[in-house]
Amino acid sequence: MPTRHATSGRLLYAQSGGVTAVINATAAGVIEAARARGVPVYAARNGILGALREELIDTRKETRAAVAALRHTPGGAFGSCRYKLKSLEANRAEYERLIEVFRAHDIRWFLYNGGNDSADTALKISQLGKAMKYDIRCIGVPKTVDNDLAVTDCCPGFGSVAKYTAVSTLEASLDVASMASTSTKVFILEVMGRHAGWIAAAAGLAGDGADAPPHLILFPENVFDEAAFLAKVKATVERVGWCTVVASEGIRNAAGQFLADAGTRDAFGHVQLGGVAPTLAELVKGKLGYKVHWALPDYLQRSARHLASRVDAEQAYAVGKAAVACALAGMNAVMPAIVRTSDAPYRWKIEAAPLAKIANREKKLPKGFIRKDGFGITAAARRYLAPLIAGESAPPTKNGLPVYVQLKNVAVAKKLAPWPPG
């Protein structure tokens, strides 16, 4: 007998992995779209862990104004986590616990807002729901500053970190140029991007031409060549008087080792990186004798809502609304993907894409986006990147500071035994 498609029940929304400057805009899109359809929305506290622990938040307790303010508030309003569910075969009990929580609270739609691993989780839950004959519609909602999700043209969160990176590169370069005659000759900016160089590439928007910063971009898609790197830095300083380098955290040597491998791994099994910028700085100082300054923006690059891209904020909100539309239309195991229809003028739309084509896949920077010398971006990369950082989306301010919302996050009463048991 086929599983009945639910026409009533609750929607559960959860945030996963590293947060962004605009992930809360997606949350606002989800809540507002669901409210418009009369569907109650619960949020999982701290991502999938909240669902497992039955730590749910009733968003109906939030005012319309508070939900609207999420559109300009960075961070994750309901909390996020780095917790990867194992395979169904390795730990079926966790997935069954999720279905148990869903059943107890009449959750009929599950929206998981994250990256590659989150898409995989949503896909697996949809499969188990069918196996357990529980009617649950699972939708992956795109989010990652790394911009490495397959199928979608870009990922909400990326446009804003790209803008932050380009602006920081431009402004820091003006500082270095001012000091170069008697002080710092080389500035190194380390940006996120373990395997894909999208964020590093965005630094290239800061300038164009042989002598414009950044003078070198180091991509994880390329093998790091120490001799070529040092030669390029030396030639740039001798010609321009100073040099700006932007390096992805994930660059590797010819042996395949991360330059900044700290020897530890996170909850997703990813290698923890200890710092490319200081490693490169020591190399330049030791081999070339130049004074070097380096910077690691870390969380700053993904939380700078004051410098968010308007396009990014709009897309983040739109995928939230589209995810609800997909779920309530009865779709399952899909993700609302952004489709570019034109570069100039920039136009885009949203289409549902199967999670099976997204889960655990990684979209790296195309070879055609990296200059032949390996240290810069091409015109094709500029055409792709430029629209994504366009427009301003500044939050309201008071006394010189941005005004951000803090939700009530009222807990839903638990109905089940604690997890993990015992």
Model feature map: region roles:
Residues 16-18, 44-49, 82-83, 115-116, ...:
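Short, ordered loop/turn segments at secondary-structure junctions
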Residues 2-55:
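N-terminal phosphate-binding or glycine-rich loops at protein starts, especially the Walker A/P-loop
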Residues 41, 101, 112-114, 120-135, ...:
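Accessory alpha-helical/coil subdomains and C-terminal extensions
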Residues 2-5, 54-108, 117-118, 145, ...:
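Glycine-rich oxoanion-binding loops at beta->alpha junctions
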Residues 10-20, 76-82, 108-114, 186-191, ...:
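Short glycine-rich or small-residue beta-strand-to-loop segments that form or flank ligand, phosphate
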Residues 258-422:
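C-terminal non-catalytic interaction/assembly regions of soluble proteins
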Residues 20-30, 51-52, 94-96, 116-124, ...:
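Short glycine/serine/threonine-rich phosphate/pyrophosphate-binding segments
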